[in-house]
């Protein structure tokens, strides 16, 4: 999956299945399970312009995000009503405001030194955005990037041949394979997707709590 795919998606606003108009219900319900307190820094990979960031900031957390599309990052700050400071940091463009840093560029080129320390990860739309071969690269990269910070992870599961993706189906056994060596992987919630995924096929969402092994 090439970067041009996602740039085109944002240019044409084809972000169904990823962007929600309000904070994710699983985030609101389960974020207190993570061992972090207000003031902690939360990493949101492949963040787009998610409203989850506004919710996290409103709860007193600091947020770092990574996003490929400059359009998405600019729309995020516009919707937050914040004018960012824009600088170049390593291979990325950094958009900064009080309590918020978004690194625009390839997440696989993001380094721990550039990102800085984080205390937790909220992954609702990153792992599922990637095809299987890229998920096998992404998971260990995220673990190294965040120094095995605890994660709250949401994955779709559906009959993959019925829908090309993204978002892709990530069945529970794959989640355990990807993260089981580094984390205690606990399933904490599951729910059907109302109306099906993109209205095309039945799907469920699985919520996982990943804590250091």
Swiss-Prot record:
SUPFAM superfamilies registered for this protein in UniProt: S-adenosyl-L-methionine-dependent methyltransferases
EC number: 2.1.1.67
PROSITE patterns: SAM_MT_TPMT (PS51585)
Tree of life domain: Bacteria
Record keyword Isomerase present: no
A biological-process GO annotation: methylation
Organism: Xanthobacter autotrophicus (strain ATCC BAA-1158 / Py2)
Name of one Pfam family that matches: TPMT
GO cellular component, one term: cytoplasm
Enzyme class at the top of the EC tree: transferase
Gene name linked to the record: tpm
GO molecular function per UniProt: thiopurine S-methyltransferase activity
Protein name: Thiopurine S-methyltransferase
Similarity-based family: Belongs to the class I-like SAM-binding methyltransferase superfamily. TPMT family.
Localization, UniProt: Cytoplasm
Chemical reaction(s) catalysed: S-adenosyl-L-methionine + a thiopurine = S-adenosyl-L-homocysteine + a thiopurine S-methylether
Positions with a binding annotation for S-adenosyl-L-methionine: 10, 46, 67, 124
Keywords: Cytoplasm, Methyltransferase, S-adenosyl-L-methionine, Transferase
Matches recorded under NCBIfam families: TMPT_Se_Te (TIGR03840)
Main location: cytoplasm
């Amino acid at each position: 999956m090439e970067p041009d795919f996602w740039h085109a998606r944002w240019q044409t606003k084809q972000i169904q299945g990823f962007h929600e108009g309000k904070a994710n219900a699983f985030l609101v319900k389960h974020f207190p399970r993570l061992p972090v307190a207000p003031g902690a820094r939360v990493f949101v990979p492949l963040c787009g312009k998610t409203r989850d960031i506004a919710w996290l900031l409103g709860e007193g957390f600091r947020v770092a995000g990574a996003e490929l599309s400059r359009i998405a990052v600019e729309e995020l700050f516009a919707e937050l009503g914040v004018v960012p400071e824009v600088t170049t940091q390593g291979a990325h463009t950094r958009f900064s405001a009080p309590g918020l840093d978004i690194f625009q560029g390839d997440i696989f080129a993001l380094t721990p030194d550039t990102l800085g320390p984080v205390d937790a990860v909220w992954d609702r739309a990153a792992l599922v955005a990637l095809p299987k071969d890229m998920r096998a690269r992404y998971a260990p990269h995220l673990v190294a990037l965040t120094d095995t910070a605890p994660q709250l992870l949401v994955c779709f599961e559906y009959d993959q041949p019925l829908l090309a993706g993204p978002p892709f189906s990530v069945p529970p056994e794959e989640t355990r394979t990807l993260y089981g060596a580094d984390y205690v992987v606990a399933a904490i919630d599951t729910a059907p997707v109302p109306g099906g995924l993109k209205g095309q096929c039945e799907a469920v969402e699985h919520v996982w709590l990943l804590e250091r092994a």
